[in-house]
Amino acid sequence: MPREFDPRAASKRKHGDTSEDFAPAKKKKILPPKHEHNHPSVNELKKRIRDVKRLLNRVDLPADARIIQERALAGYEKDLEDELARRNRSQMIKKYHFVRFLDRKAATKDLNRLLRREKEISKSDADSATKDGKLAALAKEIHVARVNQNYTIYYPLTQKYIALYAEKKQKKDKKGPTASSDNQSQSDSDGGAGAGSKLIFSTTGVRPPMWQVVEKCMEEGTLDLLREGKLDAQIGGADSPAPESKAKVTDDAGKVRNQDTVSKKSSGKSREADASKSKQDKKSKRAPAKEDAYRDAKNNDNDDGDESDGGFFEI
């Protein structure tokens, strides 16, 4: 027999009931909005600069409005310059990020190896004279290694990075563990940072020009300014021209282009004038020739008429 339904037996869910049958619905996590960088658009800034320049070219512009527009133009040009510099900086960082990482890793490994060697020499029981000589020679190597490390870290982010270390191509020998131990001893004697990297200027003998700059900035304590590119005017003046010189170059280029367009237009007009003159000359030459031919034909017709009076009707 089926059981009869008892409404008293069915009870409502009590407050605080945490059974599986009456589990509360999970609330959606509300994530905070992502911080978006509101950088100005380059095309929008260029459009505003063009509009302001077009407005300043008006002759009937009042003096107070002209002053306001000139200030706005200076602000737009500064914003455009900053935005282009920011984009160039981010592009250079992405381009040379991996090379800088490998160089920094090799330089830190080289520096740590030299520091361990210095501790070993200082703790050794050798003579004081030999110990001092070794420590003095090692101090120079440590200084070079520190400059190399700072070179990889504080190289200007807005300039093309020149690598310090190159990968060594190791040949695969099949001589067993003795060959591998010999290779390790050779790498340690060469003074390289690791098994797969080697200083470039140790073979060429020429350091990058920025190396001496980094060494000088270490003494002056201006490495952070060097990394942000605020010392470019004092260091890399020959590599990158100043903005004023760039503006002059662009102005000169614009003048040359305008002169070329004017000369092209004038040459085109002169060609059209020459062509029209030649056409008129041809027409003037053709006109008397046509008149002569017409006269000759008329005279011939008159002569034929005098000779045959009547034609077929002549009796």
Swiss-Prot record:
Compositionally biased residues, Low complexity: 179-190
UniProt keyword annotation of Coiled coil present: yes
GO cellular component: nucleolus; preribosome, small subunit precursor
Keyword rRNA processing: yes
Region (Disordered): 1-43, 173-201, 234-315
Organism: Aspergillus clavatus (strain ATCC 1007 / CBS 513.65 / DSM 816 / NCTC 3887 / NRRL 1 / QM 1276 / 107)
Any one GO biological process: maturation of SSU-rRNA from tricistronic rRNA transcript (SSU-rRNA, 5.8S rRNA, LSU-rRNA)
Protein's name in the database: rRNA-processing protein efg1
